[in-house]
Amino acid sequence: MKSVRYLIGLFAFIACYYLLPISTRLLWQPDETRYAEISREMLASGDWIVPHLLGLRYFEKPIAGYWINSIGQWLFGANNFGVRAGVIFATLLTAALVTWFTLRLWRDKRLALLATVIYLSLFIVYAIGTYAVLDPFIAFWLVAGMCSFWLAMQAQTWKGKSAGFLLLGITCGMGVMTKGFLALAVPVLSVLPWVATQKRWKDLFIYGWLAVISCVLTVLPWGLAIAQREPDFWHYFFWVEHIQRFALDDAQHRAPFWYYVPVIIAGSLPWLGLLPGALYTGWKNRKHSATVYLLSWTIMPLLFFSVAKGKLPTYILSCFASLAMLMAHYALLAAKNNPLALRINGWINIAFGVTGIIATFVVSPWGPMNTPVWQTFESYKVFCAWSIFSLWAFFGWYTLTNVEKTWPFAALCPLGLALLVGFSIPDRVMEGKHPQFFVEMTQESLQPSRYILTDSVGVAAGLAWSLQRDDIIMYRQTGELKYGLNYPDAKGRFVSGDEFANWLNQHRQEGIITLVLSVDRDEDINSLAIPPADAIDRQERLVLIQYRPK
C-alpha cells in the first residue's frame, strides 16, 4: 500500500512540475525559438536529413535532437508544450535511468525513489529539462551510456558483456548525432578512473571494440546521407563547432576555469546542503566500486568542461544524474546517523526563500529602485514572485519540523517556481525575450506582410514559428546564420543597412514590408538610419516599422 502511495505521489510530482505548467510559459529567444522553428520546418518540408533554420542550411548541430523535437510538435502541435515535449520526455527518461541504476547498485527501492525525486527537483535539471534545448537529449544518452558500461562490466558471461558494450556504442552514436563528438569524449574520461582503480583494463580492451563498431554503425546511415547531400557539413561541424567553439582563443562563451563552481552551487538547490557530504562520502568510500563509479561520472565531465575555453551551464547537466544518486545515498545515511546536513539544507532553503522575498520587494514598484523590474500595473506578477519564494521558504521550514522524516519535502521547495514562473515574468523582459508576446501585440500588422526583415536571429525564429513562415529576411546582422547565408541559393535572404533603401525601392510595390528591430530601451527610434516609414509600433525593446506600397 505504501508503494502505491509513493507512486501516486511521484506521478503527481511529475505532473505539477513537468506537465501542467509548461504551456503557461512563452518561448524564450534565441534558444527555444530557434529549435522550435528548425523542427517546424523539418515537419513542413519533410526533410529529415539536413537541418534548416529560416529555410537556410543550419549546421551547428547534428540531426537527432531535431528529430525528437519534431516528433513532439507532430504529436502535440505547434504550441509551447509541443516544442518542449521532447526535452521533458528526455528528462523523464533520464530520471527513469536514475531509478533503475540506483536500484541496481543498492537494491533499495526507497533510495531509488529518493534519487529520482532529488534529480527531478534539482534547480539546474528542472530549468534545463523544461527548456527546449538539446542538452537534455545528450544528458540522456550520456546517462544511458553510464548505465550500459556498468551493465557490461558487471556481466558474468561474454554474451552479457558484448550486449552491454554494443548498447554503449549505440548510446554514444546517438549522442554524436545529437550534439557531436563530445558524446565520445565524456564517457571515455568518465570511465577511465573507475577502470584504473578496479583494474578492469582487460575487459575494456577485449570488448571495447564492440562499442566502437556499434557507434559507427549508428551514425553511419545519416552521416553518409548528409555527406552526400551537403559535402561540407562534417568539415564545418568538426572544425567550427568543436575546435573553435571549445578549444581556440576565440571560442564561443569564453569563461574562467572556476565558472562551474557557482553553477554547481545554484544548480544543487534545493539540495545544496547535501552537496559537500555527498562528495566527501563518495571520496571516503572510494574503495566501493559503485561509489567511485558515480563520483567519476560527476567529477570528470566537470573537469573536462572546466578546462575547455567555451562554457555554458547546460554542458554539465549529465553530471547531476550521478550526483543525485550520491546525494540520496548520503541523505539516508545522514537521516539515520547525524541529520546535521539535513538541517543545514533546510536552513539554506529558508535563507534562499527569504532572500528572494526581500529581493522581489527591492525590485518591485514599491521598492527603492528608480526603474523597478515590474511596473505598478504588473502587481499580480510581483505577488506571484513572492509566492514562489514564500513556498520555497515554507517547505524549507517544514523539513526542519521533524528532520529525520520530513527532509524529503525539500523536493517541494521549487513547486511555486514550477507553477508560477510563467505568470511572474516582467513585461519588460517579455518584450525583448518572448517574440510570441510581440507577435500577439502586432498580429494584425504582421500577418499581411509580403516581406519581414529583422536584425535578430532569435526574433526571426520566433516570428517564423509564430507566423508559420520561413522566409524571414535578416537585416544588418547575420549572426549564427552567416554560414548558411553564404550559399548561392541563399541570395536575397540578407539585406545590409547600406542596401536597405535601394532594396526597399525595388520591392515596395510587391506588398507590405515590415521591419522588426531590436533597440535599447532608451534609444530614440527617430534616429535610426532608415527611410521614413508609414507606420511605427514600438513594444519597448522591439519596434515594428512598416512600409506600404505607393
UniProtKB/Swiss-Prot annotation:
GO molecular function annotation: 4-amino-4-deoxy-L-arabinose transferase activity; mannosyltransferase activity
Gene Ontology cellular component annotations, sorted alphabetically: plasma membrane
Keyword terms: Cell inner membrane, Cell membrane, Glycosyltransferase, Lipid A biosynthesis, Lipid biosynthesis, Lipid metabolism, Lipopolysaccharide biosynthesis, Membrane, Transferase, Transmembrane, Transmembrane helix
Subcellular location: Cell inner membrane
GO terms (BP aspect): lipid A biosynthetic process; lipopolysaccharide biosynthetic process; protein O-linked glycosylation; response to iron(III) ion
Membrane topology of this protein: Multi-pass membrane protein
Enzyme Commission numbers on file: 2.4.2.43
Stretches that traverse the bilayer: 7-27, 81-101, 111-133, 137-154, 165-185, 204-224, 255-275, 288-308, 315-335, 346-366, 382-402, 406-426
Its biological purpose: Catalyzes the transfer of the L-Ara4N moiety of the glycolipid undecaprenyl phosphate-alpha-L-Ara4N to lipid A. The modified arabinose is attached to lipid A and is required for resistance to polymyxin and cationic antimicrobial peptides.
Family statement drawn from the similarity comment of this UniProt entry: Belongs to the glycosyltransferase 83 family.
PANTHER family attached to this UniProt entry: MANNOSYLTRANSFERASE YKCB-RELATED (PTHR33908), UNDECAPRENYL PHOSPHATE-ALPHA-4-AMINO-4-DEOXY-L-ARABINOSE ARABINOSYL TRANSFERASE (PTHR33908:SF3)
Name assigned to this protein: Undecaprenyl phosphate-alpha-4-amino-4-deoxy-L-arabinose arabinosyl transferase
Organism the protein comes from: Escherichia coli (strain SE11)
